[in-house]
Amino acid sequence: MASEASVRLGVPPGRLWIQRPGIYEDEEGRTWVTVVVRFNPSRREWARASQGSRYEPSITVHLWQMAVHTRELLSSGQMPFSQLPAVWQLYPGRKYRAADSSFWEIADHGQIDSMEQLVLTYQPERKD
């Protein structure tokens, strides 16, 4: 029973492919679910301030490695998945390179209760 409750942490997944909005699969066939997407500044603040601006918000994504059942899936309109990449490839220096060539830093790779968690942060280049 102890082995079921503990998560064996090693290196982060080498690659994550989108399966459905908010759902990714790694090279070992494990499912990763997007549980938090945070924009800084918030999407509302960004919309107010961005008229005529090219500034992009930073994005932080929390992914949990967990089994997914079809009936539990959220529709794509329920969470802001449209700004997440279709593919993340592990890159040297604790970061992922996305399909659009953007870089996402690994802010955390650890355990929350019995779930393996991967936290990625995108910091856009300032275009002032």
Curated annotation (Swiss-Prot):
* Keyword field: Chromosomal rearrangement, Proto-oncogene
Q: Name one GO biological process term.
A: intracellular signal transduction
Keyword Disulfide bond among UniProt keywords: no
Q: Which domain of life is it from?
A: Eukaryota
Pfam (any one): TCL1_MTCP1
Gene Ontology molecular functions: protein kinase binding; protein serine/threonine kinase activator activity
Q: In which tissues is it expressed?
A: Expressed in a variety of tissues including placenta and testis.
- Asked if the keyword Transferase belongs to this entry, the reply reads no
Task: Kindly state the subunit structure of this protein.
Answer: Interacts with AKT1 and AKT2 (via PH domain). Does not interact with AKT3.
Q: What does the protein in this record do?
A: Enhances the phosphorylation and activation of AKT1 and AKT2.
UniProt family annotation: Belongs to the TCL1 family.
An additional note in the Swiss-Prot or TrEMBL entry is: Activated in chronic T-cell leukemias (T-CLL) carrying rearrangements of the 14q32.1 region.
Name of this chain's protein: T-cell leukemia/lymphoma protein 1B
Report the gene name.
TCL1B
